[in-house]
Amino acid sequence: MSAVYGANRTKYLDPTTTNTLSRGLFGGKLRVAVDSYEASTLTNGSTIAVGQTLAIGDKVVAVLLSCDALGTSTTLSIGDAGSATRYQAAVSTQSAVAGSIAIPADGMGYTVTGTDDTIILLTLGGGNATGTVKVTVLYVKE
């Protein structure tokens, strides 16, 4: 059996000028942005911008999605203008969704660069949607 350390734990234990932890990885302040949208025949391909504009350097920890059954064959993905599925690939919303947090590995801990990734976007696919969508964005800033 081995005792090993994660990459950031190693940097924490032996900090140098070349391996300093970036902002928010240890001791950052967790922030929460809660938002909702009441869809009324929202058309396929529409986007819903949620939460506040994220600052350069913020790290997205998770994005939680809950919604009513929005309509036959509908889906929602969670991302931004740079990647529509950065935080969650299309999840079926034909039935109600309760607290979906299936964030892909590349999206967990994603550092906002300030290019096209400062606003969280939900993208509707598969058909028109009617119902309530609720989103909670957890992110870290220094």
Task: For each feature predicted by the language model, list its residue ranges.
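Surface-exposed, low-hydrophobicity beta-strand/loop segments enriched in small/polar/acidic residues
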Residues: S2-E142
